[in-house]
Regions:
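Short alpha-helix carrying the canonical HExxH Zn2+-binding catalytic motif
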Residues: 73-89
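Membrane-helix interface segments
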Residues: 3, 75, 92-96
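Catalytic Zn2+-binding segment of zinc metalloproteases
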Residues: 84-101
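Multipass alpha-helical transmembrane domains of eukaryotic endomembrane proteins
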Residues: 66-73
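Metalloprotease/metallohydrolase-associated module, dominated by Zn2+-dependent proteases
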Residues: 2-40, 45-53, 57, 62-66, ...
Length: 140
């Protein structure tokens, strides 16, 4: 009975997070087609280690830098947990995740990377990143 409930709950979350899961599948196939990937099935989510820099979370998919795979450093551990924090945001916000977190986070990353003014600020002080850290239990 418990297994059946878990399957039903998983199906409901897949539907609740449908926009980001669909984008995650597309991104996965692009990476799988054009580069080597390491896939780790973690039950309710899939970690994909590839040529991406840093991390990206789309529904059930966490895309992480290949160098992070089996790397025990504290920085890598925090980055992986932080990315999983974004996955928790996706679970909470469902279809609103793309607008509330995804777009805002991408704009913040672009501003922080491209303009010196923004680099003077702590990257993780932005609301999307601070909340992901909090959900994942990451302390900086």
């Amino acid at each position: 009975m418990k297994k059946i409930l878990n399957y039903i709950l998983s199906a409901l979350f897949l539907i609740w997070e449908l926009p980001q899961n669909l984008i995650g599948v597309i991104v996965f196939y692009i990476y799988a087609t054009f580069s080597d990937v390491i896939v780790v099935d973690e039950g309710t989510s899939v970690s994909v280690y590839t040529s991406i820099k840093g991390g990206l979370s789309l529904g059930a998919f966490c895309f992480l830098q290949r160098g992070y795979y089996r790397n025990p450093s504290k920085y890598v551990e925090k980055t992986i947990l932080h990315t999983k924090g974004h996955s928790k945001q996706s679970r909470i916000l469902g279809p609103l995740y793309i607008i509330v977190i995804g777009v805002a986070s991408l704009i913040w990353k672009a501003l922080w990377t491209c303009f010196k003014y923004f680099r003077n600020k702590d990257y993780y002080s932005f609301y999307t990143e601070k909340w992901a850290d909090k959900l994942a239990g990451v302390e900086r």
